[in-house]
Amino acid sequence: MKTLGKLIASKLIEVKAIKLQPNNPFTWASGWKAPIYCDNRKTLSYPQIRSLIKLELARVISETFGDVEAIAGVATGAIAQGALVADLLGLPFVYVRSSPKDHGLENLVEGELKPNSKVVVIEDLISTGGSSLKAAEAIRNFGCEVLGMVAVYTHGFPMAEQNFEKAEVKLVTLTDYDQVIEEALRTGYISAENVELLREWRKSPETWGI
C-alpha cells in the first residue's frame, strides 16, 4: 500500500501537474535551470484528485493545527484549493495577493478576518519559501496569528527549511521531491540514470545546468 506522500506524488505525475525533464531542463522565471516543472492547479480539473488533495489538506490541518479559526490561500495557485478546504472545515477564508492591487484599497489580503484569528495558510508549492513566507507575513500584518502553513508539494530545498525556521512558520506538506522521484522511477517515467541528475539539482539549484 502506498503512503499518502507517494499516492499524492503519483497523482501529480499522472495528470502532468509535475513534469520531469532532466535532459531537457526548464528555465524558471528566476532564471534557474531546473529538471522539474510544477503546476498543481492542473489537479483542479480532475475531481477525484482535487477531492483527495482537499480531504488530506483538511485532515492535516485538523490534526496539526486543531485550534485553527480561518484559512488563507496564497494567490493564485492555492486560492481554489484553500477555499475548498475552508468550506469543508466550515471556516472563514481569505486569500493573499503577491502584490497589492493597483487600484481601490490596494489590499494584500482579500476578505475579512476577526482580529487575532488563528490562521493556517495553504500553498500549492514551496520552492525557496520567499513568496510563501511573504503571504504569512501579510496575514500577521493583517492582525492575525499564523499557526503554520500546509502545502501540497515542496522541492525540499535546505534554504526553504532555513527560511521557514527563521520566520517561525511551521510547514507541513503532503508530498515532496524525493517521493516524486521515487514514484517517477517506479512507474518508468524516468530512468535510473536520471535519478542522480535530479538529486544533484536539489543540492545546488542556483548553479545546476549552467
From Swiss-Prot:
Highest rank taxon of the organism: Bacteria
InterPro entries reported for this sequence: OPRT, Or_phspho_trans_dom, PRibTrfase_dom, PRTase-like
Coiled coil spans: none
Needed cofactors: Mg(2+)
Similarity comment text for this entry: Belongs to the purine/pyrimidine phosphoribosyltransferase family. PyrE subfamily.
Subunit and interaction comment: Homodimer.
Protein name as annotated: Orotate phosphoribosyltransferase
Organism field: Porphyromonas gingivalis (strain ATCC BAA-308 / W83)
